[in-house]
Amino acid sequence: MCRDHISQLQPLKICDGWSVVLNNLNSEKGMQEKCELLILQNEKRKAFIKVSYENHQFHIKVAGLNRDKIYEDESFDEIEQLLEELEYQIWSVGSGVLEGVQPLTQQIPDFLRLKIPAGWTVDYITLKDTDPKTLEASDDAWLFDFNQDLLQISHKAKNLLLDVGWYPEGDPTGNYGIELIKNEDWENPLEDIMCTELKELIAQLDHIFMREMKNEYQSAGSNTCLSTEDNMRRCLVY
């Protein structure tokens, strides 16, 4: 069931600071009933994004965590239209546009789209959608896109930290390194994986997320994540 859930999730370009409160956003066309599909929360920007489905339309709402301000409230017939607007809002709000910072005028970076289930927060991401197997050894991308700080995602309720980097930095003969850390114990990672292909990296990340959803990394207190999600949801406007 968890494997099916991960495989059906819609991958998204996401930036630093967003926490996934709820994620049932997939590409299925057969939804008939009213349902919530996605809730993202950004503590730094004091905002959340909610995606829902009702009356045969997708709805996206961008609102403040203080409950008294709705910034965007739009509806779309097709999921492709929704995804375009959703990624724009993720990056626009994440860049600080709600606080009077310069509006997002540049193109959204070509970051790797990820399937992130509920409970995880993106601490930082610079991971590009660039397959190292397609690059020449002299390509400048090795200098700018392949370093030790590509992705860090944390699951605070379960004290998990997922870290991705390229080792050695900028080396065409290197590899992706994936580590899953619990309770800040870097000496004894729960996962320590190396791979050289982008598609393999994606598969490994999906597998780790699937195992987390099945509580395979948690020795006790399997309900912690649910109670944390409930607490986060209480802050939101429905």
Predicted regions: what they are:
Residues M1-K46, N66-D77, G96-A157:
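Negatively charged, low-complexity tracts enriched in Asp/Glu with abundant Ser/Thr
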Residues K61-R113, G174-Y238:
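Mixed-charge, Lys/Arg-enriched low-complexity segments
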Residues Q57, N159, D171-T173:
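Coil-to-beta-strand transition motifs
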Residues V20, L40, I49-V51, I60, ...:
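Hydrophobic beta-strand residues in large extracellular and virion-surface proteins
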Residues A47-I49, L160-L162, E191:
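Short beta-strand segments
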Residues K50-E54, K156, G165-E169:
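Short beta-strand micro-motifs enriched in acidic
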Residues D149-L151, L162, Y176:
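Residue-level detector of short, conserved catalytic/binding motifs and their immediate flanks
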Residues S154, G165, E179-I181:
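Residues in well-ordered beta-strands of folded domains
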